[in-house]
């Protein structure tokens, strides 16, 4: 799969249009001080335990951690918090806080679409 061509991510029955964090600046800043509307931001990594923060965030966010095309962990964070994923992950999807029951999506299949 060519990473730059990913336009959508499907998590179970949910579908997200994504902005790919495909360079150092986008990965470093993520959603800090910006609003990408209803889209989500997708981060791709080599398999590891991902640590992140919500410093300078303008709003709470939901974060979905993905490994082997399955949701392995999901969390809702307010601004000015830190979090380290307890599971190994190869991708992270972050988006504005929603009404999704994050516990319900653990284990859901994830599809990366063009």
Curated annotation (Swiss-Prot):
- According to UniProt, the name of this protein is UPF0127 protein MJ1496
Task: Please name the PANTHER family in this protein's record.
Answer: UPF0127 PROTEIN MJ1496
Checking Gene3D superfamilies in the record gives:
Protein of unknown function DUF192
Q: List the disulfide bonds.
A: none
| InterPro entries (UniProt xref) | DUF192 (IPR003795), Saro_0823-like_sf (IPR038695), UPF0127 (IPR022906)
Top-level taxon? Archaea
**What family classification does the UniProt entry report for this protein?**
Belongs to the UPF0127 family.
